From Swiss-Prot:
UniProt protein name: Small ribosomal subunit protein uS3
Family membership: Belongs to the universal ribosomal protein uS3 family.
Main function: Binds the lower part of the 30S subunit head. Binds mRNA in the 70S ribosome, positioning it for translation.
Signal sequence, start to end: none
Originating organism: Granulibacter bethesdensis (strain ATCC BAA-1260 / CGDNIH1)
SMART domains found in the cross-reference section: KH (SM00322)
Annotated gene: rpsC
Length: 225
């Protein structure tokens, strides 16, 4: 049987870059675990901010964390109080000063991770899965996506037998390496058990002469303090 490889991992070094950007020889495993702890802490603290990506860079031993969020105001807080508390918490975990940047996601409707999390939250609130999927597809296509595919799996609607339902509009060329495909997964914890949500969003093709070929998403958004 065929299986779908993660489209982001397949395109690393082609039109996507890594979310952890640093080099370490013998210290690799410790820094990797530090990254996992920092990401877990941020996702837990900022669950209401619509966090899509957390990019961690370590130039000259000082970590630099960039948070891509749909609601940066929730991260920053009143007069910057929340972001300062967050920075102190990360500094305590990392054992060294941490530089923190917030980048606003201007179109959360075409961010695969945020779309998947939104559908998962609707499933937890007992919204009909077909309605949630169709609404997400319509919003994404309206805001400029060239194609979108959504998979929902599990005991959908409380059914006795788990199944997979999917909905697609436009084209999603998973085999085309120059295609800019965003991918996100989320889990809905319902009273009947867990339901998985997968989202693929095709945003267009990145050509060799495109100056944003390294990472279109990073070039679209300018960091803000």
């Amino acid at each position: 049987m065929g299986h779908k490889v993660n489209p982001i991992g397949l395109r690393l070094g082609i039109n996507r870059t890594w979310d952890s950007r640093w080099y370490a020889g013998g210290d690799y495993s410790r820094l990797l675990h530090d990254d996992l702890k920092l990401r877990g802490h941020l996702r837990k603290k900022l669950s209401g901010a619509g966090v899509s990506r957390v990019v961690i860079e370590r130039p000259a031993k000082k970590p630099r964390v960039t948070i891509y969020a749909a609601r940066p105001g929730v991260v920053i807080g009143k007069k910057g109080q929340d972001i300062e508390a967050l920075r102190k918490g990360l500094t305590g975990m990392a054992g060294t000063d941490v530089a923190l940047n917030i980048v606003e996601i201007r179109k959360p409707e075409i961010d695969a991770t945020l779309v998947a999390e939104n559908i998962a939250q609707q499933l937890e609130r007992r919204v009909a899965f077909r309605r949630a999927m169709k609404r997400a597809v319509q919003s994404a296509m309206r805001l400029g996506a060239q194609g979108i595919r959504i998979n929902c799996s599990g005991r959908l609607g409380g059914a006795e037998i788990a199944r997979i339902e999917w909905y697609r509009e436009g084209r999603v060329p998973l085999h085309t390496l120059r295609a800019d495909i965003d991918y996100g997964v989320a889990t809905a914890k319902t009273t009947y058990g867990t339901c998985g949500v997968k989202v693929w969003i095709f945003k267009g093709e990145i050509l060799a002469q495109d100056p944003m070929a390294q990472d279109r998403r990073a070039a679209e958004q300018a960091p803000q303090r």
